[in-house]
């Protein structure tokens, strides 16, 4: 009695489409509009070749001394994303700092978290870099990003300038 061997085919699952492809890879009027709006900012056409769109969530603010240095640092982050083959997009979110917010920044932590979550969720972002530097801003950004469940990198750095009494 001969045994027949059944061929078992293992089908490879295709990698899921990136979130950003739901905006930029479309071949309809909406895809055209999304690409056109982005190209209006000077983004070249080759950025839409399927590379990951990486959001830079920036808490830069002149009202928050521990986040005031992120304006310049964001440019280096953008260059790094480009060198790694990504498409960087920077967006602002609420910045919290105890120095000027009254009565306390803690009252706004959850609001900042919601700002981050909805900004990431609503836009064509495949991963995000969080730029934060205060004890209220850092947890709020991390909480918001965790709610969206995308690859996330945190740059937490505070730079407070000192002065001398003359």
Predicted regions, residues:
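N-terminal amphipathic/basic leader segments beginning at the initiator methionine
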Residues: 2-51
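Gly-rich Lys/Arg/Thr-decorated short loops/hinges at beta-loop-alpha junctions or inter-strand turns
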Residues: 15-24, 54-61, 91-103, 120
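Glycine-rich phosphate/diphosphate-binding loop of Rossmann-like nucleotide-binding domains
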Residues: 50, 54-55, 61-95
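A glycine- and small-aliphatic-rich helix-loop capping segment at beta-alpha/alpha-beta transitions
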Residues: 72-76, 107, 111, 143-154
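Glycine-rich oxoanion-binding loops at beta->alpha junctions
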Residues: 33-42, 82, 87-130
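Short, ordered loop/turn segments at secondary-structure junctions
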Residues: 59-61, 93-96, 133-136, 156-160
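A short, small-residue-rich loop immediately preceding and capping a beta-strand
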Residues: 120-141, 152-156
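Residue-level detector of conserved catalytic or cofactor/ligand-binding positions
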Residues: 160-166
């Amino acid at each position: 009695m001969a045994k027949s061997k059944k061929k078992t085919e293992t089908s490879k699952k295709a990698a899921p489409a990136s979130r950003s492809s739901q905006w930029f890879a479309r071949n309809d009027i909406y895809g055209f509009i999304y690409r056109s709006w982005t190209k209006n900012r000077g983004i070249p056409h080759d950025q839409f070749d399927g590379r990951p769109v990486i959001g830079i969530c920036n808490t830069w603010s002149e009202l928050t001394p521990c986040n005031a240095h992120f304006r310049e640092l964001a440019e280096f982050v953008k260059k790094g994303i480009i060198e790694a083959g990504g498409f960087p997009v920077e967006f602002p979110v609420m910045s919290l700092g105890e120095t000027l917010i009254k009565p306390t920044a803690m009252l706004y932590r959850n609001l900042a978290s919601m700002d981050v979550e909805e900004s990431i969720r609503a836009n064509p972002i495949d991963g995000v870099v969080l730029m934060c530097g205060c004890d209220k801003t850092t947890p709020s950004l991390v909480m918001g990003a965790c709610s969206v469940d995308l690859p996330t990198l945190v740059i937490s750095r505070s730079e407070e300038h000192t002065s001398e009494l003359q």
